[in-house]
């Protein structure tokens, strides 16, 4: 069985962000039986975006069951102690439902420069920040001294409900897969082929020896429509606005068309070991598309 989630519209490629739509779609996802809901994270982007953990705190107040995820949280752009505090807060408010999807975010170095962070040391910074955050969330009370991150000994309160808060690492590089296998609970890429997914499954299996409890999750831009042509127009316009790149760069990694088209697209990922898929719904009427996906695509994944 594949767990299914969706991204919430905390950014908009077609006008102002509508706060009510974020909460309404979260309610929809829970009522439709989805397993988790997700929000993205960017400081500087082609369109505005809400900050992820405050947004999930609001979502926690209007849901009771679905997991709440960041997809993915840019750890390097924040102080680890403040990140740990916010993560613990959302986990407590939600009753232990948070999944911390985290990534380096190196595709946009302008975000680093705007916040005074050196993008040239992003891999080392990420490893140290993640380790420091996890130590604080576990209540270790130990100091953390790395090459970049240096924290004194202290114990944060309150601690999160979950021990540990699941950490899923975003990113396509082999180094990310290996890092996830050694120190996280999941891998959560975007824009990867089914073949790449299979290779990652093999790598994690070799390193861990046991895949049980490890999530192989796919962030998948998805558009469902009555025809493949209509869906292609919608997803290509959405991605061109949000990412400023031609659709040719994304097409092979996007699921679009009728329900049959999307089910066919997903099949090789399921075969490769995908445990979770998160529909990143592109195009108009995301709530309507979510209802169609839940009715026409999700049953084939259960």
Description of each model-found segment:
Residues 1-302:
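Active-site-adjacent structural elements that line small-molecule/cofactor binding pockets in enzymes
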